[in-house]
């Protein structure tokens, strides 16, 4: 039974002043911080299957998959830098419309291809 206790995982996104913090909530009781990412340094924000994202898909980067785990047309990919290690990372997530608008307004249309 213990195996299935953590099967139900949800992600909580918090976006404040250009910093995106992601927490993973397992079994609706245990919260774990996935990471904090500086979106003001993002080089690309795009839909997962867009030409821009597919052009960078072969880069070998640390990848965080914080999406639903199912192919969803709303999934986006963000290429940015990890606040702790200062290395380029790839982040998959499924934000709602208000989160998408906040990200685009903070980083500008030159980087965002949504």
Predicted regions mapped to residue ranges:
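Structured surface patches comprising rigid loops and adjacent beta-strands/short helices at the edges
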Residues: 36-54
């Amino acid at each position: 039974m213990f195996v299935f206790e953590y099967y139900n995982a949800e992600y909580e996104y918090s976006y404040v002043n250009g910093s995106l913090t992601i927490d993973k909530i397992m079994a609706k009781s245990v919260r774990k911080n996935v990471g904090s990412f500086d979106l003001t340094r993002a080089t690309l924000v795009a839909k997962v299957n867009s030409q821009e994202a597919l052009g960078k898909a072969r880069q070998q980067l640390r990848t965080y998959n914080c999406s639903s785990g199912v192919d969803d047309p709303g999934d986006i990919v963000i290429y940015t830098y990890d606040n702790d290690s200062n290395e380029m990372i790839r982040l998959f997530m499924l934000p709602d419309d208000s989160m998408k608008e906040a990200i685009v307004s903070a980083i500008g249309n030159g980087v965002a291809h949504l």
